[in-house]
Structures are given as C-alpha cells and as structure tokens.
C-alpha cells in the first residue's frame, strides 16, 4: 500500500470512525448517566457532582505538565529516527512526572477544600475530596492513553476509558439507585474514583505488554528538560482544546446556582458531540501529520489536512442541523427544566462549527513543533474567557456563558489559522479545502 492510499479520505474516515464510535458511545453513556442523575437526585445535586468532577478533570490535565499532549510529537520523532531507547525513557520518566505532580496537586487541593468547606456548593467537602483523590488516576489514564494513540493502538487508547468505564459507571450507579432509591454526588463520585483506579491499573499492564512486543529492548534515554520545554506550551493548548468545558463550569460555579450549571453542562455536552467527531479525525490525522512534517512532505501533509477538514466540516454542519430540529426533545430527556437550554446549546454548537471551519489548527501547531507560538494565543483566550464570563453571565446567565464560548473560539481559531499558514506553510481552512476541489 503506498503512502497516498494510506492517507486517503477513506483511510482517514476508517481510522476516525472507530475513535468517533468510542467517543460517541462514551459521550452517550455519560449523557444517559446525567439524564438519570438529573431525575434521580435533581439538577442541584447533579450540578455539585459536575463541578467536583470538572475540578478533577482540569487538575488532572494540569498535572501532566504537558507530557500527555507532547506524546505524539516525541514518540513520532523517536519512531522516525528509530530510537527505541527514547520511547522507553519517555514512557518511564513521563509516568513518573505525571504521578508525582498529580499527587502533589491533589493533596494541595484537598487541603484547600477542607479549609473552605463552608463556601462549597452544598457546603459538603466529600464529593470534592473524592474528585481530588481521582486526579492522579485520571492523569495517568490520559498519559497512557496518548502513548497508545501514538502507536495507533486505538482499541487500547479509547475502549477502557471512553467506553468500558462510563458503561460500568452507569450500570453501578443504576444498581445503587434501584436497590436504595437514594443517590447523591458523594456516592457517584465514589464509584467514579474506584473505576478510574481499575482503568489506570489495567492500562498500565496492557501498555507494557504492547511496548515490549513493538519496541526493541534498548536502554532508556532521558531528555526530561527538552520534553518539558515541548510540553508546557502544549499544556495551555490542551486546556483549551480538550478541557475548556470543565474550565467554563468552574468559572460558572461561583456565579450561578448549581441547577443552572447542570443545564449549561447538559447543553454543552450535547453540542460537544460535534467536537467528538472533530477529535476523532484529529486522533487519526495527528500522528500522520507529525510523520509527514518530519519527513518534509508538505504537499502530502496539506492533502491529508484538506481531506480531514472537509470531513470534519460536513459532519459539523449536519450535527448543527440535527440539534436545531431535535435539540429541545434531547434536552427534555434530562427533565422539563432543561429545555430552556436549547438556545444555549445552539450557540455552543455554532462555536464547534467555527472550530471545524478553521481546520485542525490546534493539532497542527502541536505536532509540527510550533507550540510556543500558541502561548500568547491561549493566554489571551484565557483572559478573554474570564473577562467575558464576569461581564455577560451576571446579566445573561447561561446564554452569556455560551456567547463567551463562541467569541473565544472564533478568536483563537482565526488566530491559529494565521499561524499555521505562516509557520507550517499550509492552508487548513474549509474555504481553501473546497477551493482546491
């Protein structure tokens, strides 16, 4: 099979389809769980769980110091240069960094929660302490999963964390509700943390077996300082690319009631089905882009990106149309009080459409080594998000939060597109993709 057929639209679609199916399945299970939780314990208690879990996700993302998003570039380079020792060293040292930092972050956050219990939603520390206990587990799951993605072991990368864990969480929580008729954020967070522990341990052993079968047993090479220099800018990129919903939930927590947080989160999670599709395409094309850029095959790189952008944009347009027609019934599944979030959901879906139109600009900047140029972009986006939330949310509530997401997404997508054109030398937007038909 030649390189061109390997990177064709059908190949991208085929590779992305599995990742997309895993992520959509996981998202659907999570949505079903949140629908059930909204009915079993109410929007207010659901809001407490969402805020606690959002803190877990965000702190886990910060804890890896950029090692996780840097994995594709570092392992891609090691594979291109045939340096198995570098792969062994990165897997070992990266795991050590992630574990030590995440434990430190979790302990520090737990101490703050104990001191500030009276200011927490519901004035209870238990869900937050459990969420912080899960921070090291989730950080390790993310790091190990990205190593699997670098080798295109998509089943290992996505099935345990995206499908099996949410499915078991749903089944166990449902069983607890059926047998006790009582449920709260603390119980759900306890089950979530337990399943993360099982997932992290299983991934560790599966990944070790895979690496031993794939990589020659050479002495480990360590370039820790260089890896951190690569990873730290990517950390800020990944926060916006993958954890912005959790960031928004945390910003909203002190400003609106927990039931409104639950409505915003439900609207955002539905809109993020579009992002799952885009992420699935990125998961398949990012390792390919890293190798093509390292090999200086710019024309083939642009062709791969053009096909990926077309696929992502067409899927996004279709999804927005579906949400416009069926959005209210979908939100109504959570409960009658959630239907008011339809306008919010459409604004959030529009933000994902903007992102798809720009093309995979974020992953392109990451895997081509231009992540340093993104620092000012996402630092500005972070400041803009905070300012807009404090300006718009007090007056417009969750609609103001959705407009914040749209404006911030438009800003960083446009800015990154210009950087890709100038630094990578290709035009990834949908306008160029269709112009080249």
Language-model regions, residue ranges each:
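N-terminal membrane topogenesis motif
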Residues: 1-29, 220-237, 416-419, 429-437
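Membrane-interface junctions at transmembrane-helix termini in multi-pass inner-membrane proteins
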Residues: 138-163, 350-379, 420
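Helix-loop junctions and terminal segments of transmembrane helices
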Residues: 65-81, 150, 249, 267, ...
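Hydrophobic alpha-helical transmembrane segments
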Residues: 129, 159-211, 380-384, 398-422
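Membrane-water interface segments that mark the loop-to-transmembrane alpha-helix transition
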Residues: 14-26, 52, 64-114, 299-320
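Alpha-helical transmembrane segments of polytopic membrane transporters and translocases
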Residues: 36, 47-64, 233, 248-249, ...
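Interfacial segments at transmembrane-helix termini and the short loops linking adjacent helices
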Residues: 12, 114-131, 258-260, 298-299, ...
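Helix-terminus/linker motif at the lipid-water interface of multi-pass membrane proteins
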Residues: 31-45, 177, 242-273, 291, ...
């Amino acid at each position: 099979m030649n390189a061109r057929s390997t990177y064709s639209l059908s190949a991208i679609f085929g590779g992305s389809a599995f990742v997309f199916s895993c992520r959509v399945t996981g998202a659907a299970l999570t949505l079903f769980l949140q629908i059930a939780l909204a009915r079993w314990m109410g929007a207010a208690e659901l809001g407490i769980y969402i805020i606690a879990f959002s803190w877990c996700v965000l702190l886990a993302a910060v804890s890896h110091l950029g090692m996780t998003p840097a994995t594709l570039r570092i392992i891609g380079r090691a594979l291109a240069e045939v340096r198995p020792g570098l792969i062994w060293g990165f897997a070992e040292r990266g795991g050590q960094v992630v574990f030590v930092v995440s434990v430190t972050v979790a302990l520090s956050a737990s101490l703050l929660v104990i001191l500030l219990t009276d200011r927490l939603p519901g004035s209870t520390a238990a869900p937050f302490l459990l969420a912080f206990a899960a921070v090291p587990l989730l950080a390790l799951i993310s790091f190990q999963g990205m190593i699997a993605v670098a080798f295109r072991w998509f089943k290992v990368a996505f099935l345990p964390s995206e499908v099996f864990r949410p499915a078991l969480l749903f089944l166990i929580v449902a069983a607890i509700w059926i047998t006790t008729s009582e449920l709260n954020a603390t119980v759900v967070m306890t089950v979530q943390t337990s399943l993360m522990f099982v997932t992290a341990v299983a991934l560790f052993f599966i990944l070790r077996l895979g690496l031993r079968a794939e990589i020659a047993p050479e002495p480990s090479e360590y370039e820790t300082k260089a890896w951190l220099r690569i990873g730290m800018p990517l950390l800020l990129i990944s926060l916006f690319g993958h954890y912005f919903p959790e960031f928004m939930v945390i910003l909203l927590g002190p400003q609106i009631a927990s039931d409104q947080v639950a409505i915003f989160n439900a609207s955002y999670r539905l809109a993020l089905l579009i992002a799952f599709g885009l992420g699935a395409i990125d998961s398949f094309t990012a390792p390919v882009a890293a190798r093509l850029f390292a090999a200086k095959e710019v024309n083939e790189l642009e062709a791969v990106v053009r096909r990926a952008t077309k696929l992502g944009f067409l899927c996004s347009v279709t999804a927005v149309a579906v949400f416009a027609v069926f959005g209210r019934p979908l939100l109504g599944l959570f409960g009658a009080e959630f239907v008011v979030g339809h306008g919010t959901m459409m604004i959030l879906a529009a933000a994902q459409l903007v992102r798809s139109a720009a093309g995979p600009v974020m992953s392109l900047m990451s895997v081509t080594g231009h992540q340093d140029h993104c620092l000012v972009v996402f630092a500005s986006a972070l400041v803009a998000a905070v300012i807009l939330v404090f300006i718009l949310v007090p007056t417009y509530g969750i609609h103001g939060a959705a407009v914040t997401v749209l404006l911030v997404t438009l800003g960083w997508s446009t800015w990154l597109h210009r950087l890709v054109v100038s630094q990578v030398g290709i035009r990834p937007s949908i306008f160029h993709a269709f112009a080249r038909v």
